[in-house]
Amino acid sequence: MAEKEAKHHVVLFPLPGQGHIGSMLKLAQLLSTAGFYITFVHTERNYRRFLLTSTSFNVPKFRFRTIPDGFPDNDPRSPLPFIELQESLDTKCKGYYREVLVAVDEEWPPVTCVVADTALPLALEVPEELGIPVMILAPHSAGSILTGYSIPQLIQGGEFPFPEDADMDELLQGVLGLEGIVRRRDMSVRGFKSIDSPFVRFEVKMNQNLSRGRALILNTTESMDSLALRHIRSICPTTYTLGPFHVLLRNIKDQSHSASLSEEDRSCIAWLDTKPNKSVVYVSFGSLAAMSREAFLEFQQGLLDSGYHFLWVIRPDMVEGGLEECELTASERRYFVKWAPQEEVLAHPAVGCFLTHSGWNSTLESIYAGVPMICWPFFADQLINSRFVSEVWKIALDMKDLCGRSYVERMVKEVMSGEKGKELRKSICEMADMVKKSAEEGGSSYTNFKELIGHIKSLSLPACSSTSGF
């Protein structure tokens, strides 16, 4: 059969968390524009949530397949504990995933390759056992990859674990390519005192898996991450930078579907419409961050004392002990929603600053919109992301671990109307222009995407007829 008539089938399997699902689903939509058959693997729990918020999802040759997550349906925890979820998927769900990969469907071709989330070893290991080519998606930042990959070197060099009384602002020397940039506080493993901690072991394994695929796919651009990419390619020579996914998808398809597992409250757009340009602080700490009631009150009072309007995403499970409904009453100055259409919010002319947890998707969306940030990172890659945007790219302020009301007030005023804020705005607008050009025809992300398509087409179809192991 001539190549132009060949049918190619890509299976994508993300870690079952909002940020990872969002990145993988945008990549899946990108790949579907090449005419590939796409199978997207969801856990049953997340797929039920997805159907409640994404009823209009309709893409040709695109299907969802589900596997259990190994937890009882009535488990009230949301999100499920990260390490427990990893272990449950690994021990209870391999057979279900294997069946997705080997199932015969007369209307669908065999699997050409799998795109596996680097944070989900199961997604990589099962297709390897079946002889199916695998590519790796690392949905976090390039800086996060290097810090995670360097953990064994930090252990060997005696820089990790950190002493009990360690100065968390001290710079580390053992981080590949980022010497003199990364502080102790920027490491995802900063809170762990033993190298045998399950999370430390997971971080090491996850980053060792990067080079096991035929290629590494990153949601970044050559211009943003040239420093880190040079070292990443020494580990993974075939690395495709396609970021930002949401921008590239818009340029290629002029349409994308939401990946949100939570219902977006669009009433906030009407509220923003009533506000002057660059007068609103948008506040969102993502889908996982939690805070004490005391921290919530300090943040809120600092925002009020700043004198600016603010729109705040408050998930029902975000504040420990919950909040009374009267505490979330909207006013002329403040507005609360459980979840927001974030890309649209950041693009709104009324928004002048983003108080963020520094998740990578949020960071990219803020850069594209040209909105400077104030960063209050919570865990994982958010820590190094905050360091990069504040110290390397100089498009944000880093709050470290502080959230006192006077500190919040000062930070907001600095970004919204201070001299530092003018510098941040200028820098992020310049970066936004670079990012947009990367995703345009002829730009690095656009060109790399076309090369990735060619790479996938070049992969031979595996023989997956044997299912005796299931």
Swiss-Prot record:
Top enzyme class: transferase
Gene designation per UniProt: UGT709G2
CDD domains: GT1_Gtf-like
One Pfam family it belongs to: UDPGT
Record-stated family: Belongs to the UDP-glycosyltransferase family.
Protein name: Myricetin 3-O-rhamnoside 1,2-glucosyltransferase UGT709G2
Catalytic activity: myricetin 3-O-alpha-L-rhamnoside + UDP-alpha-D-glucose = myricetin 3-O-[beta-D-glucosyl-(1->2)-alpha-L-rhamnoside] + UDP + H(+)
Record-listed UDP-alpha-D-glucose binding positions: 340, 342, 357, 360-362, 365, 381-382
Active site (catalytic residues): 20, 117
Lineage, opening ranks: Eukaryota, Viridiplantae, Streptophyta, Embryophyta, Tracheophyta
